[in-house]
Amino acid sequence: MKTSMFLTLTGLVLLFVVCYASESEEKDFPKELLSSIFAADSDFKVEERGCLGDKCDYNNGCCSGYVCSRTWKWCVLAGPWRR
């Protein structure tokens, strides 16, 4: 049952890619498709996110309101549940 669902889903994905490729007149289709899927707005990275998720260590601190996680070594929100 799981195998047939996986094969069906894989077939649908391949059908979508083939249909999209046949309609596309661009020669660098894979690069364009991947760049459109993983495109990110540069303003969103800097202004919205702030320091959340930035790598840190105890010598190199985080922004105001964030602390360096002992476990993962990145900046997380400071709160009463943090030790």
UniProtKB/Swiss-Prot annotation:
<keyword id="KW-0964">Secreted</keyword>
<dbReference type="GO" id="GO:0090729">
    <property type="term" value="F:toxin activity"/>
</dbReference>
<dbReference type="Pfam" id="PF07740">
    <property type="entry name" value="Toxin_12"/>
</dbReference>
<keyword id="KW-1015">Disulfide bond</keyword>
<dbReference type="GO" id="GO:0005576">
    <property type="term" value="C:extracellular region"/>
</dbReference>
<keyword id="KW-0165">Cleavage on pair of basic residues</keyword>
<comment type="similarity">
    <text>Belongs to the neurotoxin 10 (Hwtx-1) family. 51 (Hntx-8) subfamily. Hntx-8 sub-subfamily.</text>
</comment>
<feature type="signal peptide">
    <location>
        <begin position="1"/>
        <end position="21"/>
    </location>
</feature>
<protein>
    <recommendedName>
        <fullName>U5-theraphotoxin-Hs1a 3</fullName>
    </recommendedName>
</protein>
<keyword id="KW-0732">Signal</keyword>
<dbReference type="GO" id="GO:0008200">
    <property type="term" value="F:ion channel inhibitor activity"/>
</dbReference>
<comment type="function">
    <text>Agglutinates erythrocytes.</text>
</comment>
<feature type="disulfide bond">
    <location>
        <begin position="56"/>
        <end position="68"/>
    </location>
</feature>
<feature type="propeptide">
    <location>
        <begin position="22"/>
        <end position="49"/>
    </location>
</feature>
<keyword id="KW-0960">Knottin</keyword>
<keyword id="KW-0430">Lectin</keyword>
<feature type="disulfide bond">
    <location>
        <begin position="51"/>
        <end position="63"/>
    </location>
</feature>
<dbReference type="InterPro" id="IPR011696">
    <property type="entry name" value="Huwentoxin-1"/>
</dbReference>
<feature type="disulfide bond">
    <location>
        <begin position="62"/>
        <end position="75"/>
    </location>
</feature>
<dbReference type="GO" id="GO:0030246">
    <property type="term" value="F:carbohydrate binding"/>
</dbReference>
<dbReference type="InterPro" id="IPR013140">
    <property type="entry name" value="Huwentoxin_CS1"/>
</dbReference>
<keyword id="KW-0800">Toxin</keyword>
